[in-house]
Amino acid sequence: MSLSNSLGLLGRKVGMMRLFTDDGDTVPVTVVDVSNNRVTQVKTEANDGYDALQVAFGSRKASRVTKPEAGHLAKAGVEAGEILKEFRVTADVAGKYAAGTVVPAADIFAVGQLVDVQGTSIGKGFAGTIKRHKMSSQRASHGNSRSHNVPGSIGMAQDPGRVFPGKRMTGHLGDVTKTTQNLDIVRIDEARQLLMIRGAVPGSKGGFVTVRAAIKAKPTAAKGAN
């Protein structure tokens, strides 16, 4: 399924836990809260030049919303959300929803389905090349003097006389958008609108994530959990 026709859900990473399968195996899962995903706008080919659904998640104080945003949300009849995201979908999918509709998790996903989860990785501050780029340390002795954890040469001198763009060097580590692909859904708690996804997803507890159908792998049946 391509990104151009897949509707996803916005959520908040609750944390990690483990489930047990019918065979007694333990499965590490990440719990994602996808409750109250509401449609704020339905875009169509005729009006906007493409088909898409705009979805809001979370809640925000009215005092924190700009007047244009307040008018946009009032037109849809929904409360302000912490995050707003647009999903490109087909005309058939867009026709199933109207502004103000709450999208349940079971309408989009099923147990055993493979999904891609996008979030902001945990920021780790300023880091050296060994931690940031997985480079190797230099020799501990045998002629090495105070150059144990330095990256080494970063370019030539007179020609070209500069450091090429993209050279892996020290800098800020983390706090970037990351996507973990092909994770399967182990369980869906419809009462609390929770997705339990096998493995780890980007970000810290309480961070926002986007969950959508996997675009690269073929779906495979996952073992059911109790």
Curated annotation (Swiss-Prot):
The record ties this protein, via Gene3D superfamilies, to: 3.30.160.810, Translation factors
Which GO MF term does the entry hold, naming one? structural constituent of ribosome
Q: Which SUPFAM superfamilies match?
A: Translation proteins
Provide the alphabetized UniProt keywords. Answer: Methylation, Ribonucleoprotein, Ribosomal protein, RNA-binding, rRNA-binding
Q: Carries keyword Phosphoprotein? A: no
Q: Which InterPro entries match?
A: Ribosomal_uL3, Ribosomal_uL3_bac/org-type, Ribosomal_uL3_CS, Transl_B-barrel_sf
Query: Which parts of this chain are annotated as the region Disordered?
Result: 135-158
Oligomer and partners:
Part of the 50S ribosomal subunit. Forms a cluster with proteins L14 and L19.
- The name this protein carries in UniProt is Large ribosomal subunit protein uL3
Q: What does this protein do?
A: One of the primary rRNA binding proteins, it binds directly near the 3'-end of the 23S rRNA, where it nucleates assembly of the 50S subunit.
One Pfam family per UniProt: Ribosomal_L3
| GO CC annotation | cytosolic large ribosomal subunit
Give the originating organism.
Answer: Polaromonas naphthalenivorans (strain CJ2)
